[in-house]
Design a protein with these regions (language model features):
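Membrane-cytosol interface segments of multi-pass membrane proteins
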Residues: 1-163, 292-342
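Transmembrane alpha-helical insertion/packing segments
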Residues: 3-32, 143, 149, 172-182, ...
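Specific transmembrane alpha-helix
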Residues: 49-62, 134-147, 169-203, 236-255, ...
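Alpha-helical transmembrane segments and terminal signal-anchor/GPI-anchor hydrophobic tails
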Residues: 202-270, 276-289, 293-294, 303-310
């Protein structure tokens, strides 16, 4: 059956969101005394959205037999765009009325508030993880074209290799925000689609070539952790083959996790939406406890950066996010997907 539930991909989603939470936790700690540790953790966790896009492409193709563009967009409007808009409200108020968001364009705060809000929503810059939504929306809009490739011209999947090399050269960030990110992540999304399309062959191929794929992964990790010159962009070198390896590894060994990651995987989109709020909340609390002052957007890394504090911080954020979503689901029932994305 084409849309048979893929437990290993479900577990992969739980692994991916855990790494994403870890990636956004790193900057909340002060790594002055442990820079190499920070670089290694950063290489492991940062840009794990690559895994999310691979999974999204895989599931898009896997479920494509029942694809209807209108109902597809309606569902994405309800479960992705609506919670994005609702959950953006606190951050939009904070970063247009009270605190200037770091990393914005020099001219940004000279613009009227309505334009600031529009630019925040178009780019996702108001909360670190939320660039994902404007970017994935571009994939939703071109879904019929992607499906046409899969159904009528699957030989075009060979373009994944040169597009991957282009992404390695260009990197994720550029002047066009979500468009740059979409270009960067496009080969990974297509890789997920291709893996699903040629599932049996792909599983055999990856199992046979696991060693060279692992070597490429480790080279990419070394390049990022040791700060080799850029370009190339090493996290794309690392995580595209790593996505293939994890897919096949979890296919064989997802039973090790049993159902421990099932709920985290099930609410992963909701975690993506809200976890940055808890990172910030803990940061505000720790600045007040340690420095005795109110956090105003700068100097929030008052906790020493090491493996123990990193794991504790990330796990706390993950648990707070999961608990919040669980409560929201209990209180709002089926409406929770529109409110918190899960």
């Amino acid at each position: 059956m084409q849309d048979k539930f893929q437990q290993h991909i479900h577990v992969f989603r739980g692994v991916a969101i855990t790494l994403i939470v870890g990636a956004h936790t790193i900057s909340a700690l002060n790594w002055t005394d442990n820079p190499l540790t920070m670089r290694i953790i950063d290489a492991l966790c940062n840009e794990s959205s690559i895994f999310f896009f691979f999974i999204a492409g895989y599931l898009f193709q896997h479920l494509s037999a029942r694809f209807r563009y209108k109902s597809y967009l309606t569902q994405k409007l309800k479960t992705v765009i609506t919670p994005y808009l609702l959950l953006s409200i606190p951050a939009l108020i904070i970063f247009t009325q009270f605190v200037h968001r770091e990393g914005m364009w020099p001219w940004f705060y000279n613009e009227p508030v309505w334009k600031q809000v529009a630019l925040f929503l178009l780019t996702g810059k108001h909360l670190a993880p939320l660039w994902f939504v404007p970017t994935i929306t571009l994939f939703y809009l071109v879904a019929p074209l992607l499906l046409a490739v899969d159904r009528k011209r699957p030989q075009l999947y060979w373009l994944i290799a040169p597009l991957w090399l282009l992404s390695i050269y260009l990197g994720r960030d550029g002047p066009y925000g979500p468009i740059d990110k979409a270009v960067y992540l496009f080969p990974v999304y297509m890789l997920g689609m291709a893996f699903s399309h040629y599932k049996q062959q792909a599983e055999v191929w990856v199992a046979r070539l696991w060693l060279p794929l692992l070597i490429v992964t480790l080279v990419g990790m070394a390049g990022d952790a040791l700060a080799w010159p850029v370009p190339p962009h090493y996290l794309m070198i690392m995580k595209a083959p790593m996505a293939l390896l994890l897919t096949v590894a979890l296919l064989r060994w997802h039973g090790v996790f049993r159902h421990r990651l099932d709920y985290i995987a099930h609410v992963s989109f909701g975690i993506f939406f809200i976890h940055a709020y808890f990172i910030s909340a803990i940061k505000v609390g720790m600045v007040y406890l340690v420095a005795g002052q109110v956090y105003a957007g700068k100097g929030g890394d008052v906790i020493p950066g090491n493996v123990l504090f990193f794991v504790a911080y990330a796990v706390t954020v993950l648990l707070m996010s999961v608990l919040t979503i669980w409560v929201a689901q209990k209180l709002t029932g089926n409406n929770s997907r529109m409110l918190v994305g899960a």
